Each structure stands twice: as structure tokens, then as C-alpha cells.
A protein has these predicted regions:
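Acidic/histidine-rich catalytic neighborhood of metal-dependent amide-processing enzymes
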Residues: 65-169
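Surface-exposed patches in mature extracellular/periplasmic domains of secreted proteins
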Residues: 2-6, 22-30, 89-94, 185-194, ...
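A non-catalytic alpha/beta surface segment that caps or lines the substrate-entry region
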Residues: 1-48
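Extracytoplasmic/secreted proteins, especially bacterial periplasmic and envelope-associated proteins
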Residues: 4-24, 73-80, 112-116, 120, ...
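Loop/turn elements at helix/coil->beta-strand transitions in domains of secreted/extracellular proteins
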Residues: 20-22, 53-57, 90-95, 126-132, ...
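Second-shell loop/turn segments in exported
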Residues: 1-7, 30-34, 62-71, 84, ...
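Active-site-adjacent substrate-binding region
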Residues: 139-254
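Active-site-proximal beta-strand/loop segments in catalytic clefts of secreted hydrolases
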Residues: 27-29, 47-49, 60-64, 97-102, ...
Length: 257
């Protein structure tokens, strides 16, 4: 995560968003994996919903890298889902965010780009207006050998969702459209917010429902295109859901603490 490569990556991502026709905001992030005095940024895109309120979905991925496992490739998924949804109206607002300082060791700290964004957005629109945060985890960069056709078992285990007990309902809302498109339900794991290690952690600790999506297929695999489509369909559906009014839904629509 050297500043020069981070700056080049930020410029590349911002340029891609701009080319799609989005207005781009650069949110400063400091410390963490970056040398003192270097300027790095979260790259934010806001897609307004049809409803004139603050209810929003956050879709994010970090663009810095800390090795093979956390390689920043989630940003490619972020860009492709943003591209796929550019001209599709949704009821709720969507924030697409490419995070700086998402890789270890800064990823768990207050200098994480996700921590900066979660705190700022919840402060401006209120955490309860963030209906959920979807974290797009990086994929392996290569197959690491001969490509094998995955059997039924491999396919079942190929996509993993991680959520929190509080995010169970949101994860279910995400899994349904994803499974319809992917033709296979993701395997879902539950973790306490403090046990999360990704960008989602910083939203979950604020009581925001989260789901982190991970594909075991490498970036170069033919199924990655289908994975992108399933994610796009999922985000579209989630951002289009009608949120029930708490008053009409006593006991179920209560704000969780």
C-alpha cells in the first residue's frame, strides 16, 4: 500500500466511475497503511433513490492490498455492479464506496476507510437510515493451477455470506435474489460484530445490518461474470425493497439497539 500506487488506484477508480456518468466524491482518509503526510481517499458515488428520504444501502470494497488474500479485487466487483445499476431506478439511495486502508493492519482500526465512511454517513443521515451494508470481498487472482470444472458440492460452497445476528433478516433479504440469479443459495455464517475482520465490521458495530459476500472462484474463472450479475441483481432488489413503516409493523419494525 505505497502512496503512489494508492493514488494511482484511486485515480483509476474515480475515472471509471466518472466514465459511467456518476459524480465522484473523494473522502480523505489518514494514517494506517500510508506514510505520514500522504493523501489517500475513499472514492464515493451516490445514486439517489426514487423516494425522497435518507433510507440508503451501502455497497463497498477496499482497493488497497495486503497480499494474495486481500488483494483489492473486490473493487472490480464494486465497479461492475455500479455499472450494471447506473440507469436502473431504485426506491432507496445507494452509496458505492471504494475504501482506502481496508487491508490489514489498518483495516480493523479507526484509520480504516470503512470506519471513516461509516461514522460520517451515520452521523449525517442517522444509522437507522442505513438499511444495510454489503461488503464485496476480494477474489483469488488466479486459479493456481489447472482449472477444474466444479462439481455440485463445489458449487454449493462457492459463495459465502457472513452476517451478524442483528443482520440475519438483511442477509436473508440479500440471499433470496442472489440465489435466484446464481441458481444456488449462498452458505451463510454468523459472527458477532467484534469478530468481523472486513469493511463490514465498522458498520456492524454501529448496529447497521451487514452482509459480506465472498466468491471462492478466482477472478479469471468463467463463473465470475455470473457472480457479478447475481450481485447486481441482489443489490437492485435490496435497494428497491419497500421498507415497512414501524407503526404498521409493531414489534417487527422496531429499531434494534
Amino acid at each position: 500500500s505505497q502512496p503512489k500506487s494508492m493514488e494511482a488506484a484511486a485515480k483509476y477508480i474515480a475515472g471509471n466511475f466518472s466514465d459511467m456518468g456518476y459524480a465522484v466524491t473523494m473522502q480523505p482518509v489518514s494514517g494506517g497503511n500510508v506514510k505520514k503526510g500522504a493523501a489517500i481517499y475513499n472514492i464515493l458515488v451516490y445514486k439517489p433513490g426514487l423516494y425522497s428520504n435518507n433510507q440508503s444501502i451501502v455497497v463497498g470494497a477496499n482497493y488497497d492490498s495486503s497480499g494474495r488474500r486481500n488483494n483489492g479485487s473486490g473493487t472490480a466487483l464494486l465497479l461492475e455492479t455500479a455499472r450494471g445499476l447506473k440507469d436502473i431506478p431504485t426506491n432507496h439511495n445507494i452509496y458505492f464506496v471504494a475504501y482506502a486502508n481496508g487491508a490489514e493492519p489498518a483495516g480493523k482500526s479507526i484509520s480504516s476507510g470503512a470506519c471513516v465512511h461509516a461514522g460520517t454517513l451515520s452521523g449525517s443521515i442517522g444509522a437507522t437510515n442505513i438499511l444495510g451494508m454489503i461488503n464485496l470481498e476480494p477474489q483469488k487472482l488466479d486459479a493456481g493451477g489447472e482449472r477444474k470444472q466444479p462439481g455440485p458440492e463445489a458449487s454449493r460452497e462457492a459463495v459465502l455470506f457472513t452476517t451478524t445476528p442483528h443482520g440475519k433478516k438483511f442477509a436473508g433479504q440479500c440471499a433470496a435474489p442472489f440465489a435466484k440469479s446464481w441458481e444456488q443459495a449462498p452458505t451463510t455464517f454468523y459472527r458477532e460484530p467484534s469478530a468481523l475482520t472486513g469493511n463490514d465490521r465498522h458498520y456492524a458495530v454501529l448496529g447497521i445490518p451487514t452482509v459480506s459476500c465472498r466468491s471462492k472462484y478466482p477472478v479469471t474463472d468463467a463463473r465470475t461474470e455470473e457472480y457479478v450479475q447475481a450481485l447486481t441483481d441482489m443489490i437492485h432488489q435490496i435497494a428497491d425493497n419497500d421498507a415497512p413503516e414501524p407503526a404498521k409493523n409493531a414489534g417487527q419494525g422496531e429499531k434494534a439497539s
